[in-house]
Amino acid sequence: MLRRMRIPAEPKVIIRHCDAYDPARIRTLVREGLEELGLRPHGRTLIKPNLVAAGPLFPHAYTRPEFMEGVVRALQDRATDSLREIAVGE
């Protein structure tokens, strides 16, 4: 059965400040945002990060692994029992 994401009547943007790339802190902030929006991942879920930064590991822009860890763990925290897969598309 295909379930589509519920689109809110009034779109909402949540912006949070995070001082460091701490996966635990990122997890908390993202989980709180998901809760505020009433979103619960289910089925096969794809995330496509657009947050990038340059650093010593790669001189060009890339998405930090600590950020992705926090986001994926927050999605797992909020997931329904029907969540089968979380995929990352870059």
Feature names for model-found ranges:
Residues 1-90:
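N-terminal and secondary-structure boundary signal
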